[in-house]
Design a protein with these regions (language model features):
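Bilobed periplasmic-binding protein-like "clamshell/Venus-flytrap" ligand-binding domains
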Residues: 18-24, 52, 215-235, 277-280, ...
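Ligand-site clamp/hinge motif
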Residues: 65, 72-120
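Long beta-strand-rich cores associated with HINT superfamily self-processing modules
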Residues: 354-382
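Alpha-helical secondary-structure segments
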Residues: 6-12, 54-55, 83-85, 135-180, ...
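Ligand/substrate-recognition segments at binding pockets and active sites
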Residues: 63, 206, 210-283, 324, ...
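Gly/Pro-rich hinge or "lid" segments in bacterial periplasmic/extracellular proteins
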Residues: 2-7, 13-85, 211
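Structural transition elements
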Residues: 177-215, 233-238
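Extracytoplasmic/peripheral linker and loop segments enriched in polar/acidic and small residues
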Residues: 1-4, 202-203, 254-265, 270, ...
């Protein structure tokens, strides 16, 4: 990597990466101020020390309370920025998020909207409820290396026994799409085909799942028992309760719910000391590899501990593809391999549901990556 001149950066890749240009908008490729880091060391991110190149700069930061940004007069397009200051509040509870919104304390929510409040809010303030496609998949992650989950029959039974329609339409009821794979079908560069089982009725899926469990040695007299891990969240708890009930009702699997705080939850998944875990992945960039690369055998994000030479080989071929049609076909093949191996239990493709005050102008919600920039917004007189 080298700077050719003040406005040109040249990057030489070790191998062809057709989607490289999409990676450049990811925060990990943002430039950092060398002089500020050398001067302030670990305190270079503090207000007064940090140097930014965006429309806003850091004014105040109180850990676990708020982050305040103010308009940057040195931003190249500062003349087009309207909002002078924006405050971000770290709110962990979905219900608290809505309550603070309704009290007038905040102008826009960020968390998942509470299941029990969504329909009520749609009736009471329909113009303030925004629901848009989001490049994320909610799924249950199976520990592919731990017996008995290293048996594809057991993994497939869990996949088939999950009633996505009930989860999406009855439990969550916010417009999410039932998922049949890992990569959302509306991802740029994806032309995915639905697997055969997705066209079956839930009754047929349950029958096939029971057959597979019986082949693996599990019956009504000797049922499969699993621990379902989820991180602390109102939503994840409700979905975990529903999932455990569905697996019990549909295919006779006994489920014990295990709750952990976020950091412990991540450690448990990385260490592989779990059976099945709540999981979700949101794209870092709008291209299938943002999902598929996380399932490579050597990926640090592969907490399903899925190891497939066949899948790895397909993904290696995508880098050698000479045109978009070839890559698209290989992405489809890779998804089919994940489905054949039942590496995960896909549940639904997200929508982004949030509350936005009517006086917030410029918010569209149309970016599937949810890149929402305050510099594009304004406040209408009210």
């Amino acid at each position: 990597m080298k700077a050719v001149d003040d406005h040109t950066l040249e990057v030489t890749l070790s191998e062809p990466v057709p989607y490289f240009y999409k990676l450049l908008v990811h925060p990990s490729t943002s430039p950092v101020p060398k002089a500020a880091i050398e001067k302030f060391g670990e305190k270079w991110t503090q207000p007064g020390n940090i140097v930014t190149n965006g429309a806003y700069t850091l004014k105040d930061w109180v850990v676990n309370e708020r982050i305040v940004l103010e308009r940057s007069p040195t931003y190249w397009n500062n003349a087009k920025t309207v909002i002078n200051q924006v405050t971000y509040l770290p709110i962990a509870s979905e219900v608290t998020d809505v309550n603070r919104y309704r009290s007038g304390e905040i102008d826009m929510t960020y968390n998942n909207m509470p299941i029990e409040l969504f329909q009520k809010l749609k009736k009471e303030i329909p113009n303030e409820v925004h629901v848009d496609p989001y490049l994320c998949t909610y799924y249950y992650e199976i520990n592919n290396q731990k017996p008995p989950f290293n048996d594809v029959r057991v993994r497939t039974a869990l996949k088939l026994g999950m009633d996505r329609d009930i989860i999406v339409n009855k439990v969550k009821a916010q417009g999410d799409m039932p998922a049949y794979g890992y990569t959302p079908p509306y991802t740029d560069g994806a032309k995915l085909t639905q697997p055969e089982w997705f066209g079956w009725s839930q009754e047929k899926r349950n029958e096939e799942a029971k057959k597979l469990l019986a082949e693996a040695g599990y019956t009504a007299d000797k049922p499969l028992t699993i621990n379902l891990l989820y991180n602390t969240s109102d939503l994840h708890k409700k979905l975990a309760i529903a999932a455990s009930s569905l697996w019990k009702k549909n295919i006779g699997v006994n489920v014990k719910l295990v709750n952990q705080e976020w950091k412990t939850f991540l450690d448990t998944r990385h260490q592989g000391t779990f059976d099945v875990a709540r999981a979700g992945w949101c794209a870092d960039y709008n291209e299938p590899t943002s999902f598929l690369n996380t399932m490579l055998s050597n990926s640090s994000m592969n907490t399903a501990h899925y190891k497939s030479p066949a899948f790895d080989s397909i993904m290696a071929e995508t880098l050698k593809a000479t045109d978009e049609a070839q890559r698209t076909a290989l992405y489809t093949k890779a998804e089919q391999q994940l489905d054949k191996d039942s590496a995960i239990v896909p549940v639904y493709y997200y929508v982004n549901a949030r509350l936005v005050k009517p006086w917030v102008g410029g918010y569209t919600g149309k970016d599937p990556l949810d890149n929402t920039y305050t510099r594009n917004m304004y406040i209408v007189k009210h």
